[in-house]
Amino acid sequence: MRPPAPPGGSPPRNFLLREVGPRLESPAFSTCQVDFYFVESENIVKIFCGSSNQPLAKSICASIGLELGDCTVDAFPDGETFVKINENVRGEDVFLVQSTSPPTNHHLMEMFIMMDALRRASASRITAVLPFYGYARQDRKDQPRVPITAKLVANLLVAAGANRVLTMDLHAQQIQGFFDIPVDHLYAAPVIYEYLKKKALTDLVVVSPDVGGLKMAHAYSTTLEVGLAIVAKRRKNATEVESMAVIGEIRGKNVLLVDDLTETAGTLTAAATLLRKKGAKKIYACVSHAILNEMGIQRLRKSNIDELITTDTVLRPAIDGVKITTLSVAGLLGEAIKRINSNSSVTSLFELKGSRTS
């Protein structure tokens, strides 16, 4: 039987069902009358962050009108991480923002410890928000006796207490299948599209710097309604390219190189050199995650790339001698958090014109 609604109306959408009066446990009472009443329950959102990208976490909070959660993240003299959650999270919907960018292992361990603290503090749900998912390039066994570390990270996130994952531009989309919990995989592309439309570039061709990025490049070219080309390459090893060739017409065109991430910038700068030799005019590079170690910075300074367009998924210091435009994905992540909390669909956040990407 449905319990009665409160006087004057139907029960609220979010409610707790409570009994009025003592529970009768004696077998002598096979039937009894029990009254119920509805108590409205707020599905409170709290957002916390580790040390990897606090500016992004604060921007996410600002985009949805929340304060960043209060926690202490420190280290003991021997280097061990110490975490304390400084406010009540019992029964609340918690989102933990942490990019697993370099130092990757430190940021991962910090995240595991924070999730353990939140779980032990009785948070009702913990969503791991990873704007950048580290170890994503180790997604398969491509050599004998090597690990699949992307899967190991997925296992560890769940073991630490994650009930859901929100991430952006995974290096390999199949990583979503490494989890047995819900994964919401967003794309930075809508934010980047808006910037490119404002630039109003003419004679533009989208170029994938390798075969693996062709699907992403196709989505860009379809949305921007421009041509598509690809740089085919043969690798000597993980950091060196042996030979490259351009498939498509780029002579006299402005070029947009697109990729999900760059660290050493070897692929991007080598492709830019080849494209300039083949007659490209201005060369723009667009990556969701610009990790950029010292080698990558030096390569960009000497490269033919006129502008590097990226996002704030990874925190990095200012770099002299390279034109870098950083776009914020805080609004996109904030909207996803609102929808997840209210059990609304996030589908429209990862659907791109001409290509459903997830």
What do these predicted ranges mean?
Residues 1-20, 24-358:
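PRPP-associated nucleotide enzymes
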